[in-house]
Amino acid sequence: MPLIARSSSSNMFQGLDTMDLVVSRYDESANSIASYIGPILNITPLSGLTTRVIIYSTGQDEPKKLRDDLRHHIPFNVDVIVRQRPNVGRECAAFLHHITTGWQDLADHTLFMQAELHHSWSVRWRMQDYFVPNTGFLSLSDVSEYCSSWDQCWDHSTWSESSDVLGSIYSRASPTLRQGFTLTYRGQFIASRHRIHSQDKQLFQDLLDEFVNPRSMAHSSGYAEHPWLPGKSDSMDRPLFGYTIERLWGVLICDVPMYNWRIDAQVFCHLRLDQSCIPALRSCKTVNVLISVLVTH
């Protein structure tokens, strides 16, 4: 059986108890949010888990009403929690806030997502086929790019980042590694508590400060004048620094080597392994699929 392939039996998840769905929400309706969450809760790997839905809302809704509306629209008996946040930092700040304030209470796995999933069918497919108890990090984006080093990194869009900024983050996240890394997109991924706790909490706290502190480097005029995002301006509710952190979740949570295999000329499996590296090539069946998986003990 492939290392990363799913099992048809929920017994595979014995000993894995909790899963939180952490949602960054602006003003999306409860019905819309539930239309993405409901199908996710229905997939096999989540059956039998104690699951919570945690909404970080920056909208004007009264939290209790939003919570009640979500409970009405989500067709499962799950705990729904709505936490109000200031409209600062978008999803990156919401995720970092969740990690830092709930450090001791993180679920076994957390699905981080925005209120509107990109390619939700692909998210469900990836979770169904590749989410297993020892998953440490699973990118749920339909897009992926690879950077050979932090001082030569750019992607298909107009994004890049200064080597000083990338070098600083990379050296703190992966101080013993000098290898390439895969960029993540869309602000949707799964991370285990084990992998999050493998990092220094202060790193996440310092990154959060870049978003919420108006005097931070990320909100300085010098940073905002970089040429790689033409036509975009920085603000507390739309920080340019968010484009960078969106791409670096794998770096922040997975400080281990990257292994790449190419299958059938067009299929890539990006596997991140804590210990031995075992190609799970038989699990990669679909053309043009980009997967990032970290396997823990």
Q: Where is each model-derived feature located?
A:
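ER/Golgi luminal nucleotide-sugar-dependent glycosyltransferases, focusing on the catalytic module
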Residues: M1-H297
